[in-house]
């Protein structure tokens, strides 16, 4: 029976781009997937047909061959076809790939491939980063099939030796004066074929699922730090080792504190009376409030260090410090009495010409005067 056109199977024009091919495949694969149509042989056949069409059209070389020769490019027994040596699952990037690499190196039977590593982005608060915490996360992943235990075969059966390569995982092809060694197109280098696949995973040995993990965040982590959980990534194909899971940390912005390394910074407003006369204030830390002594004549922007109130180093457990930057606040919403008092205070400063009370201002304006005097000379 004549095979249906691959473009018609996916419902796309022959001029379709890669994006259109992927979109059409995703839509049809979800509709006819065996997990959604259990026991429906028609849907199962349709799914295989869709998958075959996608694998050909998404590959540039295979698509080019199909456009030139049609289904004959992938069928055995066509002596006039360039591709007659290979079965439907042939990979043309293998056939026309690094020929000399195959001559001198040669492919070997494929080993079971380790599962892919996964990455999970986790947001935590500054308090959680400083003190450490345990969190549960749920991740989508491929896990080893519990029915076949990753073998991909139905219960009570085993994979059989590939008849094309006789279990070697590789075949030899004549290329003029050379014999080229290639990965077997039937078993894809495995050396075995699953003739009776598992009903649950359909021979893949893995199933899509979600799993919940408890992740311990040690004290001291910062944004862009990563935690590695061994063997918690995707399950490997054909029973191979699982990949790893990397938890990428992002620390949320805090309303009071900023972090630089193991030190914490915060701004503390004080009124100009305390700045001038000194006093004692309470400042926040991540462990509660502590008292901070403000000396007289404190200038705005001065840093005060409170030792041991920062972040513990994740490497050596040394504790950072808290640095408080005081900001002298200009009073607002003054009543008449307060304004009169400030005028009186200001007049007293003027009487001293600011030399004693505002030495910084005096230095600045003296510098400005010298600057303009030099310009007029």
Curated annotation (Swiss-Prot):
Where does this protein chiefly localize? cytoplasm
Q: Which residues are recorded as binding Zn(2+) 1?
A: 145, 148, 198, 201
Annotated CXXCXGXG motif repeats reside at 145-152, 162-169, 184-191, 198-205
User: Which molecular-function annotations from GO does this UniProt entry contain?
Assistant: ATP binding; heat shock protein binding; unfolded protein binding; zinc ion binding
Cofactor annotation comment: Binds 2 Zn(2+) ions per monomer.
Gene3D superfamilies cross-referenced by the UniProt entry = DnaJ domain, Heat shock protein DnaJ, cysteine-rich domain, Urease metallochaperone UreE, N-terminal domain
Q: Can you give the residue ranges of the J domain?
A: 5-70
Binding annotation for Zn(2+) 2: 162, 165, 184, 187
Is Lyase one of the keywords UniProt gives this record?
A: no
> Zinc finger regions typed CR-type: which residues?
132-210
Cellular-component GO terms for this entry: cytoplasm
Task: Give the record's subunit note.
Answer: Homodimer.
Explain the purpose of this protein. Answer: Participates actively in the response to hyperosmotic and heat shock by preventing the aggregation of stress-denatured proteins and by disaggregating proteins, also in an autonomous, DnaK-independent fashion. Unfolded proteins bind initially to DnaJ; upon interaction with the DnaJ-bound protein, DnaK hydrolyzes its bound ATP, resulting in the formation of a stable complex. GrpE releases ADP from DnaK; ATP binding to DnaK triggers the release of the substrate protein, thus completing the reaction cycle.
Query: Domain text from the record?
Result: The J domain is necessary and sufficient to stimulate DnaK ATPase activity. Zinc center 1 plays an important role in the autonomous, DnaK-independent chaperone activity of DnaJ. Zinc center 2 is essential for interaction with DnaK and for DnaJ activity.
Official protein name in the record: Chaperone protein DnaJ
What gene is behind this protein?
A: dnaJ
């Amino acid at each position: 029976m004549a095979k249906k056109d691959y473009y018609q199977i996916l419902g796309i024009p022959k001029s379709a781009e890669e994006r259109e091919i992927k979109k059409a495949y995703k839509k049809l694969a979800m509709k006819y997937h065996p997990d959604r149509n259990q026991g429906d042989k028609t849907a199962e056949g349709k799914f295989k047909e869709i998958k075959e069409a996608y694998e050909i059209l998404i590959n540039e070389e295979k698509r080019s061959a199909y456009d030139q020769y049609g289904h004959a490019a992938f069928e055995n027994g066509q002596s006039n076809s360039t591709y007659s040596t290979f079965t439907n699952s042939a990979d043309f990037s293998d056939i026309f790939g690094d020929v000399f690499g195959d001559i001198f190196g040669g492919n070997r039977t494929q080993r079971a491939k380790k599962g892919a590593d996964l990455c999970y982005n986790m947001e935590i608060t500054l308090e959680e980063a400083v003190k450490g915490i345990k969190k549960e996360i749920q991740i989508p992943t491929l896990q080893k099939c519990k029915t076949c235990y990753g073998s991909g075969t139905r219960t009570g059966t085993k994979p059989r030796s590939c008849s094309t390569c006789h279990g070697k995982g590789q075949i030899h092809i004549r290329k003029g004066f050379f014999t080229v060694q290639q990965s077997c197109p039937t078993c894809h280098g495995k050396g075995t074929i699953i003739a009776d696949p598992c009903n649950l995973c359909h021979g893949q040995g893995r199933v899509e699922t979600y799993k919940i993990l408890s992740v311990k965040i040690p004290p001291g982590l910062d944004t862009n730090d990563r935690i590695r959980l061994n063997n918690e990534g995707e399950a490997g194909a054909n029973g191979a080792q699982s990949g790893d899971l990397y938890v990428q940390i992002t620390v949320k912005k805090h309303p009071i504190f900023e972090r630089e390394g193991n030190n914490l910074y915060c701004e503390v407003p004080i009124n100009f009376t305390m700045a001038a006369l000194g006093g004692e204030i309470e400042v926040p830390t991540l462990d509660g409030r502590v008292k901070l002594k403000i000396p007289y004549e404190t200038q705005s922007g001065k840093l005060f260090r409170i030792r041991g109130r920062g972040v513990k180093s994740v490497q050596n457990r040394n504790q950072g410090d808290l640095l408080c930057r005081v900001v002298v606040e200009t009073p607002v919403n003054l009543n008449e009495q307060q304004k009169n008092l400030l005028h009186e205070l200001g007049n007293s400063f003027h009487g001293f010409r600011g030399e004693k009370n505002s030495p910084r201002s005096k230095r600045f304006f003296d510098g400005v005067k010298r600057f303009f005097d030099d310009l007029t000379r």
